[in-house]
Amino acid sequence: LDQSALVSLMVELFTAIRLVSAYPAPAVLPEVHSFPQSEMRRRLCEGRPCSIKAYYHPDWGVVIDETLDVHHDPFDRSILLHELVHHLQKTTGKFEVVASFCSRRMAEELEAYEIQNRYLSKANTSRRALFMGSTGKCADADEAFRAQAHSQPKGD
């Protein structure tokens, strides 16, 4: 990814997020990395086939599938925007008051999809992002899972 074009795009996307939500612009832009789908599968799906196109991790930033055309395709750009919403959720601490990990995760995803679809609507594109629910195990009582989940990236 061309870094200067990427920074410009992120500033544009954070402005769009601010216009369709109550989030402020971030003090620091997250890092964005582009990986092949095979690397995404290795990192997130233990090598099994999966359809994750991007994810956010508070320590690593945003990781996107290298096949996404975030500079020219409005829907692909909205996928990056969705992950940038997760960055804002984390840096503002908006959902930290939700005690249940599962409830917090669901609320974060629902909001990110809502903002993504508002963005797509304003971009005058007919495509919309669909939230199909959580595909993984989520049990608040399972302490081992919760500890592991906090160190796992968010993928959509």
Predicted regions and their residues:
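Sequence contexts marking disulfide-bonded cysteines in secreted/extracellular proteins
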Residues: 44-51, 101-103, 137-139
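Extracellular/mature segments of secreted proteins
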Residues: 50-58, 109-112, 121, 145-150
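Soluble non-cytosolic domains of exported or imported proteins
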Residues: 4, 70-79, 102-110
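Long, well-structured alpha-helical subdomains associated
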Residues: 122-156
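Post-HExxH zinc-binding segment in Zn-dependent metallohydrolases
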Residues: 99-135
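Auxiliary, metal-adjacent structural segments of Zn-dependent hydrolase domains
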Residues: 1-63, 69-70
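Substrate-binding clefts and substrate-entry loops adjacent to catalytic sites
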Residues: 64-71, 90-103
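Active-site recognition of the HExxH zinc-binding catalytic motif
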Residues: 78-91
